[in-house]
UniProtKB/Swiss-Prot annotation:
Record-linked PANTHER family: 60 KDA HEAT SHOCK PROTEIN, MITOCHONDRIAL (PTHR45633)
Protein's recorded name: Chaperonin GroEL 2
PROSITE patterns according to UniProt: CHAPERONINS_CPN60
GO MF entry, a single one: ATP binding
Phylogenetic placement of the source organism: Bacteria, Bacillati, Cyanobacteriota, Cyanophyceae, Synechococcales
Reactions performed catalytically: ATP + H2O + a folded polypeptide = ADP + phosphate + an unfolded polypeptide
HAMAP family xref list: CH60 (MF_00600)
Record's keyword terms, sorted: ATP-binding, Chaperone, Cytoplasm, Isomerase, Nucleotide-binding
CDD domains recorded: GroEL
Length: 555
């Protein structure tokens, strides 16, 4: 395929036009009074959304040179979303500001490589300053504020996420799903849940709900297939003497063993229920061990020298309650094994840090959540499909912001943290001796004003005036774009996760620096649209003759 090539200033100007086209579309959504963007879809109704990264992903420019610039900013938004889960619009605004200031200096003769070094030094200084200013999330009120601000000042969503975090702890899993109803609801599954149900409907104890429920059961765990009832006799005798229900989790239970358990249950001799072990291979063994730690039992496995024939009540786990449907099993354990569970979570967390696989990371995080306390599901409802998608994106952003805040703490929101941190660059700039490095630091210092200016502009205020009023104020003092007041933002609950601010700055500076140092731009030449096929002469119908009517000449 043929290539189009641009050199020198032309290449950088084309990239800047692409950056501006995308950033100008995205930045109108920034802040509590940010507007929406309507996205036309090839199929279905248009979407009206307020989510920066979703808007950025949809934009493709006609000019291939400009489109390359837009694609680079898409990468900024996507990277920030991946790392911090929120802050994509802030990252886009910062990238645009750094590119604009940087290219002005490059056009004036500054060395882009040296400018880049100055930008990198400035960002490193700011990252340290953000970490120093961050305050840990102390209570539920802080979580509620962060979630509400990120969801577009939706207090209902803020409260829902705060409730979810309180119920499943910071290690729990919180997911967002679309609901079939109009209401948005929180559903919490306490205990450990896995996707395996009872092996026979004859185990059911509640016929109306078609579930098995037992209080205070014992739990037998094995990685073996059980086919003969003789394998279970020693354990069943111990359980019968104890007078407690028994949950059996095994690779499989079939034939005589399953039939005997069903008959004993039907006759009221012994309350039992059998389910297959979740997952496969090594992951199955790991999850069985998780259940063993949670319930204080042991996995009966030849790998550790245990067999069913030798098993007794000492290897059985204990739970407060079990609820089993045809598809899922939920085990709610007590706090007796809290120390062992904490040690197991720490062990899984070490594995999480070592893995490079996204799939493994997701599965390990799920295991931590199930051990730590459970899973919460926020079911999003809305009157229309368009509103549902917009609301779901906002709630996902709020959830990601909350996780980031718990991880690295919070700083004052509303764009004021970046503005006030510009003063941290003064001493760095004074310590540098190379003029263009100083310029690089100055570029970042000016760009730090951009998010606050845009938030104010979107709220109908004059951004430049707001920036000047706040420049020399206390660190926590800022502009509340929702009310138009200047106030202590921390006291007002307007907070940003430090991780989001840090990631937005780092990702924006990284891509913007690459644009500044670009000298040649090579893109694919667009292929011409294929011409429409020419209209034929309908040769198959020449003369429109009608067979059998040739003798009908004109009189």
């Amino acid at each position: 395929m043929a290539k189009l090539i641009l050199f020198h200033e032309d290449s950088r100007q084309a990239l800047e036009r692409g950056v501006n086209a995308l950033a100008n579309a995205v930045k109108v959504t920034l802040g509590p009074r940010g507007r929406n963007v309507l996205l036309e879809k090839k199929f279905g109704a248009p979407e009206i959304i307020n989510d920066g990264v979703s808007i950025a992903k949809e934009i493709e420019l006609e000019d291939p040179h400009e489109n390359a610039g837009a694609r680079l900013v898409q990468e900024v938004a996507a990277k920030t979303k991946e790392i911090a889960g929120d802050g994509t619009t802030t990252a886009t605004v910062l990238a645009q500001a750094i590119v604009r200031e940087g290219l002005t200096n490059v056009a004036a003769g500054a060395n882009p490589i040296v400018l880049r070094r100055g930008i990198e030094k400035a960002v490193a200084t700011l990252v340290e300053a953000i970490a120093a200013k961050a305050q840990p999330v102390a209570d539920e009120a802080a979580i509620r504020s962060i979630a509400a601000v990120s969801a577009g000042n939706d207090d209902e969503v803020g409260q829902m996420i705060a409730d979810a975090v309180a119920k499943v702890t910071k290690d729990g899993v919180i997911t967002v799903e679309e609901s079939k109803s109009l209401a948005t609801e929180l559903e919490v599954v306490e205990g450990m849940q896995f996707d395996r149900g009872y092996l026979s409907p004859y185990f059911v104890t509640d016929q109306d709900r078609q579930v098995v429920e037992y209080d205070n059961p014992l739990i037998l765990l094995t990685d073996k297939k059980i086919a003969s009832i003789q394998d279970l006799v020693p354990v069943l005798e111990d359980v019968a003497r104890a007078g407690r229900p028994l949950l059996i989790i095994a690779e499989d239970i079939e034939g005589e063993a399953l039939a005997t358990l069903v008959v004993n249950k039907a006759r009221g001799v012994l309350n039992t229920v059998a389910v297959k072990a979740p997952a496969f291979g090594d992951r199955r063994k790991a999850i069985l061990q998780d259940i063993a730690v949670l319930t204080g039992g042991q996995v009966i496995s030849e790998e550790v020298g245990l067999s069913l024939a030798d098993a007794n009540s000492s290897v059985l786990g204990k739970a407060q309650k079990i609820t089993i449907s045809k598809d899922t099993t939920i085990i709610v354990a007590g706090d007796e094994n809290k120390a062992d569970v904490a040690a197991r979570i720490a062990q899984i967390r070490r594995s999480l840090e070592e893995t490079d696989s996204d799939y493994d990371r997701e599965k390990l995080q799920e295991r931590i959540a199930k051990l730590a306390g459970g899973v919460a599901v926020i079911k999003v409802g809305a009157p229309t499909e368009t509103e549902l998608k917009n609301r779901k994106l906002r709630i996902e952003d709020a959830l990601n912001a909350t996780r980031a805040a718990i991880e690295e703490g919070v700083v004052p929101g509303g764009g004021t943290t970046l503005l006030h941190l510009a003063s941290a660059l003064t001493s760095l700039q004074a310590s540098l001796t190379v003029a263009d490095e100083k310029l690089g630091v100055e570029i970042v210092a000016r760009a730090l004003e951009a998010p606050l200016r845009q938030i104010a502009d979107n709220a109908g205020a004059e951004g430049s005036v707001v920036v000047e009023k706040l420049r020399d104020k206390d660190f926590n003092f800022g502009y509340n774009a929702l009310t138009g007041q200047y106030e202590d933002l921390v006291a007002s609950g307007i907070l940003d996760p430090a991780k989001v601010v840090r990631s937005a700055l780092q990702d924006a500076a990284s891509v913007a620096s690459l644009i500044l140092t670009t000298e040649v731009l090579v893109v694919d030449q667009p292929e011409p649209e294929p011409a429409m096929p020419a209209g034929g002469d309908m040769g198959g119908m020449g003369g429109m003759g009608m067979p059998g009517m040739g003798g009908m000449g004109m009189m």
